[in-house]
Amino acid sequence: MAIKSYKPYTPSRRYMTGLSSEDITAKPSVRSLLVKIPASGGRNNNGRITSRHKEAGAKKLYRIIDFKRKKFGIEGRVEAIEYDPNRNCRIALISYKDGEKRYIIRPNGLNVGDVIASIDEGALDIKPGNAMKLKFIPVGTIVHNIELKPGKGAQIARSAGGYAQLMGKEEKYVIVRMPSGEMRQILAECMASIGVVGNEDWANITIGKAGRNRYRGIRPQTRGSAMNPVDHPHGGGEGKKNSGRHPVTPWGKPTKGAKTRRKKASDKLIISRRKGK
């Protein structure tokens, strides 16, 4: 997907870049697949901030995405490629032979008019958009939209340019190399889709101005070293003095590379940790 630049009629637009919309079908979204989700602004039910640096952003409707791919044995045709304001990849509108329509994450190479399917037992052609259980996918295949628990829906490799690779099979598990580089065992009964998530150039765009992040619901982030000691462990000092300690969160928890993940039962499924991250 091509990256486009803008005429610099303001200083903020001089270095701003965006993604071309040539691949988007000129067609309205399906109303039955749109729902309103009230913006939390990072607040909980008591109105207190539980996630900092968030706001409502631009008004948008949520697109209901089929992450489970349970339409077994029924072929579907790609009717449209659409923009989704809730995620950084494109979505594809699939029209099935029984008349139902669903949105899925669009992988690279999936275009209007293509036919895809999903199956619970047996294998399908290894082509972008087809979905099947991991135990039926050949070793070495690139996949996305991977389940961690059978029937729960895809949780892994869903963002723009994301993918994982099937590295091996052993009894009821398969070995998958995650997008982070981590090697992990996943139950062979879990579903996955073939291909790489599209819109891989998303990582290369330049935001260009603060307002563009505000549209996305991202508020400014104040450095801890610019605060007073009462507000942050890095605060205080004369001038731009360093904090004199390893980087921590406002609540004193180690950050910037320090491992904070608690031990879990699923740790035994991780074969090797990610490297170079």
Curated annotation (Swiss-Prot):
Residues 256-277 have a biased composition (Basic residues). Keywords: Ribonucleoprotein, Ribosomal protein, RNA-binding, rRNA-binding. PROSITE patterns: RIBOSOMAL_L2. GO terms for biological process: cytoplasmic translation. Signal peptide: none annotated. GO terms for cellular component: large ribosomal subunit. Residues 231-241 have a biased composition (Basic and acidic residues). Residues 219-277 are annotated as: Disordered. One of its GO terms (molecular function) is transferase activity. InterPro entries: NA-bd_OB-fold, Rib_uL2_dom2, Ribosomal_uL2, Ribosomal_uL2_bac/org-type, Ribosomal_uL2_C, Ribosomal_uL2_CS, Ribosomal_uL2_dom3, Ribosomal_uL2_RNA-bd_dom. It comes from the Bacteria. SMART domains: Ribosomal_L2, Ribosomal_L2_C. Pfam families: Ribosomal_L2, Ribosomal_L2_C. SUPFAM superfamilies: Nucleic acid-binding proteins, Translation proteins SH3-like domain. Part of the 50S ribosomal subunit. Forms a bridge to the 30S subunit in the 70S ribosome. Belongs to the universal ribosomal protein uL2 family. One of the primary rRNA binding proteins. Required for association of the 30S and 50S subunits to form the 70S ribosome, for tRNA binding and peptide bond formation. It has been suggested to have peptidyltransferase activity; this is somewhat controversial. Makes several contacts with the 16S rRNA in the 70S ribosome. This is Large ribosomal subunit protein uL2. It comes from Campylobacter curvus (strain 525.92).
